[in-house]
């Protein structure tokens, strides 16, 4: 297998994928400002080699999945679409947990309908506990069991997790085979270092989101200086660092701009020297 690919479920995917969240309107709510541009971005992503798209029917809600269907259906055999359940949107655009059996079942069927599929490639259980802004401890057995039952019914091929703790990952793996874990992780926030290494050992994908999220001004300045020295953007350096961090890391940077999409995809060709990696590794301690 190429170092630029990794197995997600039963398919080999390019490690630099695409996150569709920004295709919806402002605040990931409502329709995009320009639907034609959103469709163009998706088609360009595939033309640039993307075969792993991350989405959810609670983006919009419904909007992002409908745009994906309009842009890409019928889907290429090598395309893996990963979606999420476990949350819903309030009328005021708020993010709310949706963990009851009925809500989880409805979410799977909404994803199927709006994507135009009979079975979903990968469904991540998005866990919203505590304040909902980061992983918090609590059992996910009941919710994951509902998802596993839908897998047994043939509605879902593979199961993943999102916004989870190591304890929840261990709990989930006793209930179902887990093919990916999606958490916030970047150069500045490395709480999942041990988790990434453990998942890599077991051949499980790790999908970080917010590659530039939560940086302090000092951390941003260091990253910007490194990027300038390489003739690259901070986002390109952040993505390149993630690609070199571990072979099981799959990236899903999102954008609603073709120009930014092309910039992001160019990160795959950016090689970071040991000296640069050492500087970047120090950012989390600044």
PLM region descriptions:
Residues 128-286:
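Beta/alpha (TIM)-barrel catalytic core signal, keyed to glycine-rich beta->alpha loops juxtaposed to Asp/Glu
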Residues 22-36, 91-102, 131-136:
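Active-site mouth loops of central-metabolism enzymes
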């Amino acid at each position: 297998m190429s170092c630029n690919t990794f197995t997600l479920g039963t398919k080999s995917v390019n490690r630099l994928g695409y996150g569709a969240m920004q295709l919806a309107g402002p605040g990931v709510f409502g329709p995009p400002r320009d639907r034609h541009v959103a469709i163009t971005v998706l088609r360009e992503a595939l033309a640039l080699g993307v075969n792993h798209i991350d989405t959810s029917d609670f983006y919009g809600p419904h909007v992002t999945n409908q745009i994906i269907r309009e842009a890409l259906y019928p889907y290429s055999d090598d395309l893996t679409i990963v979606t999420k359940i476990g949350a819903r949107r309030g009328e005021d655009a708020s993010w709310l947990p949706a963990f009851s059996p009925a809500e989880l079942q409805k979410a799977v069927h909404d994803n199927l309908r709006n994507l135009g599929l009979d079975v979903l490639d990968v469904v991540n259980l998005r866990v919203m506990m505590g304040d909902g802004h980061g992983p918090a401890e609590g059992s996910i057995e009941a919710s994951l069991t509902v998802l596993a039952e839908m897998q047994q019914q043939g509605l879902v091929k593979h199961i993943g997790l999102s916004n989870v703790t190591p304890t929840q990952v261990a709990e989930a793996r006793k209930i179902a085979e887990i093919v990916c874990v999606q958490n916030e992780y970047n150069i500045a926030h490395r709480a999942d270092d041990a988790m990434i290494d453990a998942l890599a050992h077991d051949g499980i994908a790790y999908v970080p989101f917010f590659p530039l999220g939560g940086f302090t001004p000092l951390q941003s300045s260091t990253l910007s200086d490194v990027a300038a020295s390489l003739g690259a953007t901070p986002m390109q350096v952040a993505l390149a660092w993630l690609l070199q961090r571990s072979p099981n890391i799959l990236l899903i940077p999102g954008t609603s701009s073709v120009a930014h999409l092309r910039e992001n995809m160019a990160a795959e060709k950016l090689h970071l020297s040991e000296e640069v990696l050492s500087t970047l590794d120090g950012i989390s301690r600044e």
